[in-house]
């Protein structure tokens, strides 16, 4: 079996990825690529990254056998990779630490970020405070409303939060504004992208920093059950938590990789955020080519998901490639199914999951039913649900 080795030198995953940006950004991206190549195997850099993951984030995060959830679903045993236990409450911090350490080495005193659910913004503000960097976070005005607690957290951590009023006022618009800021302040600013999208080298770099999830999980599954799971399941918006757990498994035969997108109100309604499941045509967004929700004129279609972190019209280019080469499968789960899984995990395991992660849980429970008890599923529980209790309460007609 030929070992997986992507992207190519120009940042392409087959026909996806690449660098589609304004001329003004090309030089900055080249500088970033050169610096990342220099440091990605540098022992001092890796030692500092490992130190922060252990002592600041609290890694390794455990793999946990969800016994009562397994009983409720019936069938295969369900294991959870507990990224919700990380400092700041999600997988996002793994990547922000890696990029912030790089920013420091590049002599950039200011970092900027885009955020949807607010988790990446909080993680960026956190590490900026830890390293003494100025921090500005762009967030769609709609998401600012949905995620008020995270907005306040970022401000507590010393970040400036800029609500973006253009377009659909969500993640894609925040990304556009962050890109504009970067072009303007290129000499002193490092752009910390939160997902495996954007122009090369971001999709590769974010994946590499998140791969600690899958690397740990492989070892933990071996210790727990003496083998690897039959399938690894993760939610996919941009897709960094999924890439982080998938990547170390790509060359492992017999392990299915399943990405779960947001079906919103249903794929057939058009009100969703599932470009892979819907087989959306490829297009260019935020500096890379990928599957993209667009109309016949190539205009981006507004997306919908109950979860702010999955509410994105594109997807990381590596996911697009893994779908095409059939190494990963992509499915979608509706708002209602995700909500049901959210409540189920709360009541069976005493864990309040993020609404993003609840999409992966919903599909895992469906799949487990069709399998035998001697089989095992590993779900990436990408984040905790504290940030979502306002959304869940308001759907139940409760004001907090």
From Swiss-Prot:
The keyword Amino-acid biosynthesis applies. PROSITE patterns: TRP_SYNTHASE_BETA. Belongs to the TrpB family. It comes from Methylobacillus flagellatus (strain ATCC 51484 / DSM 6875 / VKM B-1610 / KT). The gene is trpB. It catalyses: (1S,2R)-1-C-(indol-3-yl)glycerol 3-phosphate + L-serine = D-glyceraldehyde 3-phosphate + L-tryptophan + H2O. This is Tryptophan synthase beta chain. Gene3D superfamilies: 3.40.50.1100. The beta subunit is responsible for the synthesis of L-tryptophan from indole and L-serine.
């Amino acid at each position: 079996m030929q070992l997986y080795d992507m992207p190519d030198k120009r940042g392409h995953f087959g026909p996806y990825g690449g660098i589609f940006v304004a001329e003004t950004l090309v030089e900055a991206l080249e500088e970033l690529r050169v610096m990342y190549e220099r440091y990605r195997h540098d022992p001092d850099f890796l030692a500092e990254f490992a130190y922060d993951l252990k002592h600041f984030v609290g890694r390794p995060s455990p793999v946990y056998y969800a016994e009562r959830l397994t009983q409720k679903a019936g069938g295969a045993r369900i294991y959870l990779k507990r990224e919700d236990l990380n400092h700041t409450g999600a997988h996002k911090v793994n990547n922000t630490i890696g990029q912030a350490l790089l920013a420091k080495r590049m002599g950039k005193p200011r970092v900027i970020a885009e955020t949807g659910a607010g988790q990446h913004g909080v993680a960026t503000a956190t590490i900026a405070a830890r390293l003494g960097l100025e921090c500005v976070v762009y967030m769609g005005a709609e998401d600012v409303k949905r995620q008020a607690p995270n907005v306040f957290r970022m401000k507590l951590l010393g970040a400036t939060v800029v609500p973006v009023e253009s377009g659909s006022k969500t993640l894609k618009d925040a990304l556009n504004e962050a890109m504009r800021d970067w072009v303007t302040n290129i000499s002193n600013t490092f752009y910390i992208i939160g997902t495996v999208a954007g122009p090369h080298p971001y999709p590769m770099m974010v994946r590499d920093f998140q791969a600690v999830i899958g690397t740990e999980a492989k070892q933990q599954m071996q210790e727990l059950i003496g083998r690897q799971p039959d399938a690894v399941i993760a939610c996919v918006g941009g897709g960094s938590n999924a890439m982080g757990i998938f990547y170390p498994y790509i060359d492992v035969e017999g392990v299915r990789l399943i990405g779960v997108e947001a079906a919103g109100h249903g794929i057939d309604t058009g009100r969703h955020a599932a470009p892979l499941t819907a087989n959306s045509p490829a297009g260019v967004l935020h500096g890379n080519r990928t599957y993209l929700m667009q109309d016949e004129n190539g205009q981006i279609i507004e997306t919908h998901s109950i979860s702010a972190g999955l509410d994105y019209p594109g997807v990381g280019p590596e996911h697009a490639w893994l779908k095409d080469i059939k190494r990963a499968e992509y499915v979608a789960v509706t708002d209602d199914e995700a909500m049901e899984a959210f409540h189920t995990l709360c009541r069976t395991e005493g864990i309040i999951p993020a609404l993003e992660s609840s999409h992966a849980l919903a599909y895992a429970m469906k799949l487990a039913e069709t399998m035998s008890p001697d089989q095992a599923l590993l779900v990436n529980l990408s984040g905790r649900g504290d940030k979502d209790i306002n959304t869940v309460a308001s759907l139940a007609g409760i004001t907090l």
